[in-house]
Amino acid sequence: MEEFVRQCFNPMIVELAEKAMKEYGEDRKIETNKFAAICTHLEVCFMYSDFHFINEQGESIIVELDDPNALLKHRFEIIEGRDRTMAWTVVNSICNTTGAEKPKFLPDLYDYKENRFIEIGVTRREVHIYYLEKANKIKSEKTHIHIFSFTGEEMATKADYTLDEESRARIKTRLFTIRQEMASRGLWDSFVSPKEAKKQLKKDLKSQGQCAGSPTKVSRRTSPALRILEPMWMDSNPTATLRASFLKCPKK
């Protein structure tokens, strides 16, 4: 599974997932399913944010082509993928600036158009079950919840899906592709079932980490959201990481 993750996901996402697990004292070589789940969740968060901006008139727009003359504000602030200290610094800054209620738990994104924090969920189970678990944990109507599944289903607070249909379809397609790639290598069952995961771990240890099946073809194109996040992760100065509200649209 670890080898699959390294082949399937952008190296920057893999690095962020490794740092997140290390921060919580988790071993990616043992908890390989969790490693894969974190990478998947990170990618969905970045895809959620990609290409969505607010123009100078305050309108939400989608920009996929480079326009050097456009001064655009990112519609979504990415909180997921940062270390906890930096994440809370960003959340506090947002609350102080917008007057938003501070969440009890770290959310994944902040939507400047709708003025709300967003919790993104990616589940291998029934979407409504996972949605209820998230809602019971958060216990706040202020945080918007949006759940995606590997089967193409989704569920959101008050059926408000935030994004346009095409953007959501891009996320669903990526999740379905990940599922198919896992299944083709005999990894999907262990990813879904804890019992199967133990069996797979034994196989992985026996094979000394060798990946079954052929290498996964993966695009190395860096997500625009990752380009913004990378310098923030590396910079240890909290004040330097809070970027200016308006930025030029990043190159694709």
From Swiss-Prot:
Pfam family, one: Flu_PA
GO molecular function, one term: RNA binding
Site feature: Important for efficient shutoff activity and nuclear localization: K195, K198, K199
Highest taxon of source: Viruses
Site (Important for efficient shutoff activity): K202, K203, K206
Record key words, sorted: Decay of host mRNAs by virus, Eukaryotic host gene expression shutoff by virus, Host cytoplasm, Host gene expression shutoff by virus, Host mRNA suppression by virus, Host nucleus, Host-virus interaction
InterPro entries according to UniProt: PA/PA-X, PA/PA-X_sf
Subcellular localization: Host cytoplasm; Host nucleus
Active site annotation, chain numbering: E80, D108
One GO term (biological process): viral RNA genome replication
Gene3D superfamilies: Influenza RNA-dependent RNA polymerase subunit PA, endonuclease domain
Domain observations: The probable endonuclease active site in the N-terminus and the basic amino acid cluster in the C-terminus are important for the shutoff activity. The C-terminus acts as a nuclear localization signal. The C-terminus is recruited to host protein complexes involved in nuclear Pol II RNA processing.
Function summary: Plays a major role in the shutoff of the host protein expression by cleaving mRNAs probably via an endonuclease activity. This host shutoff allows the virus to escape from the host antiviral response. Hijacks host RNA splicing machinery to selectively target host RNAs containing introns for destruction. This may explain the preferential degradation of RNAs that have undergone co- or post-transcriptional processing.
Similarity-based family: Belongs to the influenza viruses PA-X family.
Protein name stated in the entry: Protein PA-X
Highest classification ranks of the organism: Viruses, Riboviria, Orthornavirae, Negarnaviricota, Polyploviricotina
